[in-house]
From Swiss-Prot:
S-adenosyl-L-methionine binds at residues 36, 55, 76, 120. NCBIfam families: UbiG. The keyword Transferase applies. The gene is ubiG. The lineage of its organism: Bacteria, Pseudomonadati, Pseudomonadota, Gammaproteobacteria, Pseudomonadales. Pfam families: Methyltransf_23. Pathway: Cofactor biosynthesis; ubiquinone biosynthesis. It comes from Pseudomonas putida (strain GB-1). CDD domains: AdoMet_MTases (cd02440). Its EC number is 2.1.1.222, 2.1.1.64. It catalyses: a 3-demethylubiquinol + S-adenosyl-L-methionine = a ubiquinol + S-adenosyl-L-homocysteine + H(+); a 3-(all-trans-polyprenyl)benzene-1,2-diol + S-adenosyl-L-methionine = a 2-methoxy-6-(all-trans-polyprenyl)phenol + S-adenosyl-L-homocysteine + H(+). One of its GO terms (molecular function) is 3-demethylubiquinol 3-O-methyltransferase activity. This is Ubiquinone biosynthesis O-methyltransferase. Belongs to the methyltransferase superfamily. UbiG/COQ3 family. Keywords: Methyltransferase, S-adenosyl-L-methionine, Transferase, Ubiquinone biosynthesis. GO terms for biological process: methylation.
């Protein structure tokens, strides 16, 4: 059975044409992207690395990593977001290879081929996150790193990521997230270790609605990222 939620794909297909509009529903992704790329680059030194971006969508992260000197492949199951990504790279001149394929299928085709794998804001949109994590382990080279980001599952995350972001501040369309699919750091850590990945670091991402700025810090109550390593 394919690890794809067609309803989730449809949500992002409908919004795909606005992916690179910095004032659209994707404004938060554009604003947090530099913070996340810097954090990843500081730990993985992207220049010259072969990188896979799982759940690349319209290519915001993929292009940013390519601009840091990485050779990037972006994969997604959404046809419209991939079309937007391919069109945007014609405008930007940034080279990324985009493919419509699941992580699990690519792991069969390209085991141990990537120095770095990123999987950001994707795990909470698939039926079986642990399956994606196992696929990421299989695709990263021994000694390589895998980065995940998702949203914690607790009352504060429900209040801020759903009620606040979708209903009050209207930063995201209603229904973007399903609270039941949010993932606690303990769960993400356990799935990573079960797959063979060693958790090296965790960082939180917070938003101040007064200043309208994001920052990375130790608060992992809502949005967070983890760095994992496949040992040699």
């Amino acid at each position: 059975m394919s690890n794809v939620d067609r309803a989730e794909i449809a949500k992002f297909e409908a919004l795909a044409h606005r992916w690179w509009d910095r004032e659209s529903e994707f404004k938060p992704l554009h604003e947090i992207n530099p913070l996340r790329v810097n954090w990843i680059d500081e730990r993985a030194s992207l220049a010259g690395k072969k990188v896979l971006d799982v759940g690349c969508g319209g290519g915001i992260l993929s292009e940013a990593m390519a601009l840091r000197g990485a050779t990037v492949t972006g994969i997604d199951m959404g046809e419209a977001p991939l079309a937007v990504a391919q069109l945007h790279q014609l405008e930007s001149g940034v080279q990324v290879e985009y493919r419509q394929i699941t992580a699990e299928a690519l792991a069969e085709e390209m085991p141990e081929q990537f120095d770095v794998v990123t999987c950001l804001e994707m795990l909470e949109h698939v039926p079986d996150p642990s399956s994606v994590i196992r696929a990421c382990y299989r695709m990263v080279k021994p000694g390589g790193q895998v980065f995940f980001s998702t949203i914690n599952r607790n009352p504060k995350a429900y209040l801020l990521a759903i009620v606040g972001a979708e209903y009050i501040l209207k930063m995201l369309p209603r229904g973007t997230h399903d609270f039941k699919k949010f993932i606690r750091p303990s769960e993400l850590g356990a799935w990573s270790r079960d797959a063979g990945l060693q958790v090296k670091d965790i960082i939180g991402l917070t938003y101040n609605p007064l200043t309208k700025h994001y920052k990375l810090n130790s608060d992992v109550d809502v949005n967070y990222m983890i760095q994992t390593l496949r040992e040699e």
